[in-house]
Amino acid sequence: MEFKDYYAILGVKPADDLKAIKTAYRRLARKYHPDVSTESNAEEQFKLVAEAYEVLKDDERRAEYDQLREHRNDPNFGRQTQHGSAHNAEDFSDIFSSMFGEHARGQQHRQRRQGMRGQDVEMEVAIFLEETQAEQTRTIRYSLPVYNAFGMVEQEIPKTLNVKIPAGVGDGERIRLKGQGGPGTDGGASGDLYLIIRIAPHPLFDIVGHNLEIVLPVAPWEAALGAKVPVPTLKDSILLTIPAGSQTGQRLRIKGKGLVGKKETGDLYAVIKVMMPPKPDEKSAALWQQLAEAQQSFDPRKDWSKQNG
């Protein structure tokens, strides 16, 4: 039996994962299916593609094949088997045939009897930030493709599930629903469904781990004199004390008002941003002028002179 490069047959690389191999197989199986293709050698190519896939989809057989593929040009390979009997280099084709010829067909037959596991399915689920704070039940609707033995989609099966989203889930977290993926073939087990959580952007809060950040606008006099100002949280509103002399960028910690996690609850950080009022009228301008005269020693750009030596 002549050596066959199964990776080249499927058009994949030796480093590609099972998902890439499966995708290539289905594409080529549809291309060369005798009922679809008009090419003269379609049936032969179809069988070759199926043979390659049967070997590469199985981890153990793929490892054996990779070893043979790596050493196929080594004149010393195969001279000594695990049972101690010697082989000539010319026996390489016999080794390949024994492992991937009749043996392979026997493996295929056993695998067909055992059935093939269904595909795993992934889908994204968008939730609002507030919904992460308590367990939620969501109705999930999706469709599952059903493939025939030749890798072609026969039908789409619509499914509806009521799924519990646990409290404390984070963006990008995967929730596994066992057996809710694609159906198996020939009695094989169904695949799993993986829900990927996507938290919708919030108009007020930014997520930093289990903590939240909110930009807190304050008036110049609030920053200068200190004040108590209302600050929204995910559940309610609190009064936060602004210390006198606060600056833009200063962070004030509000303990326990962040995200509810599975092991801990984060904090909320209010980031101060001093906001100037609109263009002052005559009275306001006079007051600002008085302030400027009272604070003549204050130079907001003094650090520039230090940096310039």
UniProtKB/Swiss-Prot annotation:
This is Curved DNA-binding protein. Its main location: cytoplasm. Keywords: Chaperone, Cytoplasm, DNA-binding. HAMAP family: CbpA. It comes from Serratia proteamaculans (strain 568). The keyword Signal does not apply. CDD domains: DnaJ, DnaJ_C. GO terms for cellular component: cytoplasm; nucleoid. The gene is cbpA.
